[in-house]
Amino acid sequence: MRLDPHASVVEFYDALAPWYHLVYPDWEASIAWQGDALAALLAAVWGDGVRRLRDVTMGVGTQALGLAARGYQVIGSDLSPSSVRRAGAEATRRGLTLRGHVADVRALAARPGSADAVLACDNALPHLLSEDEIQVALAECLRCLRPGGGCVVSLRDYGPAPAPGTEEIKDYGHRVWEGRACRLRQIWRWRGPIYDVAFELVATGDSAEIILRTPSTTYFAVPVARVAALMEAVGFKRVRRVDGCLFQPVLVGTR
């Protein structure tokens, strides 16, 4: 298969990487609670033998850092070189071991059966713009797992897509960037089941100056139930939805 470099995804996350932490009101606290939540989920579903993890959509390390801090052996990968570099720098700053490299989730640099669990969190898979592409990625996740190993996918819970041309603004609230008070927001522009997204940091006050803006990237508003069906189609067993673990629905499946 010839890989599309997904230039818009790389450009978006390379631009966002230095200030990705602003997506969360308290990134450090979120790293900790997501690490706790995922560790509890891994133990509850697959037992205490899960130690070798692959975070195949690592980004700047929100989940990988929390799990590495709990003693898991984490290898992370992402399409965005800047995100991988930041995750590595954050791990070093914390005294953690986190191996990271640039890779497409549809073609992972991993030996078959080399992981106890694979993670793809934070609505990353819908950057793949068709069910066929998502299925390829899920098959790669399955290939990486040992028999009995588990896959964890977190996704936005999409409803029906609005009319094409609809624009939505998602306000993330007040933030501070380099000493300046601002607001963080996402701009969504719909075109059928596909929508384009950009982040903006906007100064508070009368000027409403845009301090920072990412390039746009694109998502596929795929329902959670469809991704669960695709997991089953590639060979995952006991696929089910878990709510209340993270801030988005989670799917788990076992090789």
Each model region followed by its residue ranges:
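A short acidic, Gly/Pro-enriched loop at the edge of an enzyme's catalytic core
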Residues: 110-117
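Conserved SAM-binding loop of SAM-dependent methyltransferases across substrates and taxa
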Residues: 60-72
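Conserved SAM-binding strand-loop segment of SAM-dependent methyltransferases
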Residues: 93-107
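SAM-dependent methyltransferase
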Residues: 152-222
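A short glycine-rich, Lys/Arg-flanked "PGG" loop and its adjoining helix->strand segment in the class I
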Residues: 135-147
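Conserved class I S-adenosyl-L-methionine
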Residues: 1-59
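Conserved SAM/SAH-binding beta-strand->alpha-helix loop
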Residues: 80-82
